[in-house]
Amino acid sequence: MAGSIALTRRGPLARVTLANPAKHNAIDVAMWHDLRATFERLQGAPETAAPRAVIVCGEGGQFASGGDIAEFAGFRFDEARLHDFHERIVAPALEALLACDIPLLAQIEGACIGGGLEIAACCDIRIAGSSSRFGAPIARLGFPMAPGELQLLSQALPAPVLREMLLEARLLDAAGALRHGLVHGVVADTEVATHVLQRAGHIATLSPQAARINKRTLRQIAAGGPNAAERRAHFGYADSAEHREGIAAFLEKRPPHFQRG
């Protein structure tokens, strides 16, 4: 049975669930396509209708155990098909997450392996359960990590740790992931969902405009910018309602109430 990507909405928050529970949420080709479509849909939503934060999680107490190995024989042994899988299926899906202006929070439980680790690395805030584990032990399967995916992980982990993880097919436990900055917090397994929901709820009270512009600027910096035009455009928020509301609320000693539109 194929896996699925489910998008649900509750108030200002959305949830994207990786669901292939019979295989610990292994990500099949259809799920990569659906993941891309889901985040392109979120990014394309009108600002007045978009959620203020998105929680990315797995079904059934696991985040994602990697790719669906049962599908590998269909493309991995042909160079052109293998290239297309990584560059035309996986890469655009990950890019859709990275290009999303909405804050993304990874709710990590259990296995966060391979493609699951890459998806988590695209999220802005990553919270792990104490028994979660992280890695990409694909050297055991006889293949290396694709260049774009390795570049992504190199931005989430120190180079020595990433080398050890890949060359020794080593897994990190939650404490190690926290120590090396891969995750922002570790809580008891039973508290992960509640903790992430609380953090997402807090983000939802803040300026969505500020989040959107901050994420865009961080992407520009990662790409070697911002350039002169991007620097100029950055200040277009000056006369916005959110900017005025935030300053007014501070001066009036009240919580801000940010409304889009």
What do these predicted regions represent?
Residues G58-A93, G142:
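Glycine- (often His-adjacent) and acidic-residue-rich active-site loop
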Residues P21, I127-S132, V183-A228, D239-A241, ...:
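C-terminal long alpha-helix characteristic of the crotonase
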Residues G66, E87, A91, G114, ...:
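Glycine-rich phosphate-binding loop at the start of an alpha helix
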